[in-house]
Amino acid sequence: MDSFLDLFDPGTSPPTNCDVWPEDDDDASRLPPEPQMGNVEYKLKLTSPSKLRFEHLVTQLKWRLREGHGEAIYEIGVEDTGKLTGLSSDDMKSSLITLDQMALKLGATTSVLRERSVRKDKIVAEVLVRKVPDDQECIEVMVAVLGGADAGKSTLLGVLAHGEFDNGRGSARLNVLRHLHELRSGRTSSISHEILGFDTEGDVINYQKARTAEEIRDRSSKLITFLDLAGHKKYLKTTVAGLSGYCPNHVMLVVSSPAVNVSSPTQLDMTKEHMDLALALRLPFCIVVTKTDITPADNTINWLESVLKSIGCRKVPLVIKSDDDVITASSTQPTQNVVPIFTISSVTGENLDLLTRFLYVLPPSISIKEKERLEQECCQFQIDEIFKVPDIGTIVGGVLTQGVVNIATELVIGPLDNGTFVPVTVQSIHRNKAPCRVVKATQSASLNLEKAIPGLRNGMVLLGLGVNHSACMFFQARIVVLYHATSIHNGFQTTVHIGNIRQTAAIVAIMECDKRGMHTNDSASVIFKFARHPEYVTEGMRLLFREGQTKGIGIVTQVFALQVVAG
């Protein structure tokens, strides 16, 4: 989606519900031509359409909403060529009324994001149309929160989710941390979830306005699920597993402004490490600079800009200072390598409104077509957490990567240590801490299984009965070595992350490689062997391996199925 940032500067007299921009040079009064695909629609005007024309417009809006996974952007007063012609005040009012009626026909809502004057009496407007898909309770986006220890991640999530500022000594994070040792140290060591909702008007729905997670979900048209990941180096494997296993849509990288100003090597190294993870997994990310009430963010921004513009990154930093920057960042981030940078304080609340506005307009990263395709596939649920609750039984938490699971669905779980799978039945489903009857592809959930199964572990999968249930000890992958101090040869052992799988594996064969072995930036096909037990791996899965300073990425190209002996 292209927007107006490059065309004008923000004005100084905004109306009540939207932003207004002053006139700009005629040379700049143009957007790129209207895209044929996607969720952006240009309309010169929508005044007094005939009944037939209105039905056509509704059909067109329905298609744009489908393309945008429930969200569409209408540029009113703009020709198909991208020229900003503009409308009179009366025509704009009439066009917005028509757009409201179109949205109402589909059960959608509209909100004016911004307006701009292009001539003395002509204006253009950018309007967000949002409709929760019929088979969904709300539009959902998962955001993984990364950052070094003491960067303020949990404190920031506590402020966002509970609506109360921090007292400067970590009071806000007490609502987020899960374990006693976390409360004592103030450091996250496990993966936790927090939610933040938005209603149709863009107002925040959090625990300050709702008592339970279920109420937040019921009152929200859009729900942000935060994945709070550990920042300390000794928990890095847990952090990588969370990123790889939960498949988040976006990453929010939190950086402490004081740490950069005092050049803390641990903080800076972990910031770069986490940024490399997001880049390796091809996840769009934004950066939040915290603790600006203690230290100004100028030096931090300069350092971040130099890192983002470096050869290994090649991103375009955009410091967010206004609502205009927010809208532009959300629209250009996926396609133009833009990385938004927010400077906030969890104590004073400085610029928190800009961050929440960004989360409100943040688009889902998967198209409706791709989601529908995944839902048609046979079920595959990746298990990331296992709980045994007295009088209830076994509960597994994770992400449904494909298919649909209902209550009473019959599945198989595995692989066990001998490579076999065991039949199970789903008794109940919980999502966002509330019961539900169905979970669909890309959604995270907790499933209560019918019976207890010995030997369950993280990294297992639940599969539909129509899937080939073959585990493996050996698999082949095409890998790229991102960094290694010396050379990699046969026998090299590393921790491999494939989806929710985390296990030590050894390289037993390297193809297309001479006696020198593999070095930094080298690429080759290799065969891995798992060290402990078989795993469920399929061709095309992305992998990430690391051992100490060694890092690499790759794609699984072939799987050698384990032969299970009957009986």
Listing of model-derived features with the role each one plays in the protein:
Residues 138, 294-296, 452-567:
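C-terminal effector modules of nucleic-acid-centric enzymes and ribosome-associated factors
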Residues 98, 155-160, 192-194, 235-238, ...:
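Alpha-helical scaffold elements adjacent to nucleotide-binding pockets in ATP/GTP-utilizing enzyme cores
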Residues 132-150, 566-567:
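Glycine-rich adenosyl-nucleotide cofactor-binding module
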Residues 76, 150, 156, 186, ...:
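Residue-level signature of catalytic and energy-coupling elements of molecular machines
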Residues 142-236, 246-258:
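P-loop NTPase switch module centered on the Walker A-proximal segment
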Residues 1-137:
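Polybasic/polar functional segments that serve as interface/processing modules
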Residues 142-154, 158, 162, 306-485:
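Conserved catalytic-core segments of large NTP-driven translation/proteostasis enzymes
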Residues 222-225, 229-236, 246-273, 279-299:
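Conserved Switch II/interswitch segment of TRAFAC-class P-loop GTPases
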